[in-house]
Amino acid sequence: MSVAGGVSKAVERAVVHGCEALQIFTKNANQWRGKPLDHAEIELFRQRIEQTGITPVVSHASYLINLATTFPALREQSIAAFIDEIDRAEALGLLGVVIHPGTCTAGPDDEALRLIADAIRVAFKARPRVKTMVLLEHTAGQGRTLGHRFEHLAAIITHLRGSRRVGICLDTCHLVASGYDITTEAGYRDTFERFDRLVGIDRLKAFHGNDSKRPCGSRVDRHEHIGHGCIGLEPFQRLLHDARFAGLPILIETEKTDRAQRPDAIVEDPLDRMNLDVLRSLQ
């Protein structure tokens, strides 16, 4: 949900749409750092979350961060920005920060996965007492991005000695794009059995609910409105009726209209409403 006009505005927009959970950016996703969160705005956000009962709330980290990079300056900048994301989320009382693991810039994937874990370890040491979790997002697998195999996520967690400060966010579009065919009953069953075996269902803290413009195995990340893409409605219905995922949020990241992005706009976005209504009809 847009934070135009201040983070507390995202809660108002969520209420307009009848949301039960929420994902926000705490700053511009295409900038390294944002201006510090105003204390009054933090308190207003927390009050509105408590009043509305919207939970959980997570943030999404900047797209610029690359915890897998081998370039020293970019690595230092990425880790600093990552810690800033954690600080902002902690100040707002969020469950976690969703982050793409990273993109390999040189060498084998195994070494890049170790670099990701090392960067997370640095952040944990810098902020030893924060409650906000790091939620690794499973990716579509474009280029040399990491995290598109469950084995990648498992390796990062293993390098971190199984830290319980690490959770997972699964994106339905990314699952299909990376080759996990959840569109069939058998494929859905096999995918989550494999995830449980390699990573653990207990690590799963949130879903991104997006259809896919591209077919299974394309390794191209293109979100589509729910029911309008290559995934279809049945997999979402399975998710909503799967007892293992009861209580987990499904956060949509589909295209919005321009009018909902204005700082003064606390209005219903017809595209968000359409996708939410589709999901609710499947419950």
Language-model region placement:
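Acidic (Asp/Glu)-rich catalytic clusters
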Residues: 12-19, 37-58, 85-93, 121-131, ...
